[in-house]
Amino acid sequence: NRNRGHDKRDASNLGWAISELSRVAILLNENGRDGSAFEAAAKPIVDIVLNGIREDGAVGSVWDGKTGAVVTYNGDGAGFMLMGLARYHALTGDERILPVIERAFDYYYSHDIDNFRCFGGAMDCSSIDKEGIQPFFTTAKYMYEQTADDKYLEYARKAAWYFASWIYIHNPI
């Protein structure tokens, strides 16, 4: 893990944390239980992330765990962050979220997905992978449901093509 021994937080893990804390809160709330503790745990992470997104939409890939400042913007794990923000929006309706997701998604679509590359979940390197596209697909679906903007259908279609390009079919006969 590239962050071992350092007080750094990466976008993949922060995004997953927001996503799963929000998911648990939603499930608890839907089943008559109190999910507010999970929502409260996600909120400070969301606030740090929203403060670290550049004007062009780039999402920080590593944050300083003590100060909350972005250490680098190299793109790793941005999809996981967008997925987390989408789940948090589904939980809270926080009006700050959708414009940020839109700006960031436009950035990563034009810089990465439309160029048929995606940096994802590996914590030990910055490399192109297949896993990193899934949260973009999930977020595109959510954004289409929220906005009815057809561009998110195109984003989802391109994400699906990218993922399918990793499938290797072996026929030994």
Regions found by a protein language model. Name each.
Residues 1-173:
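Glycan-recognition and catalytic cores of secretory/periplasmic carbohydrate-active enzymes
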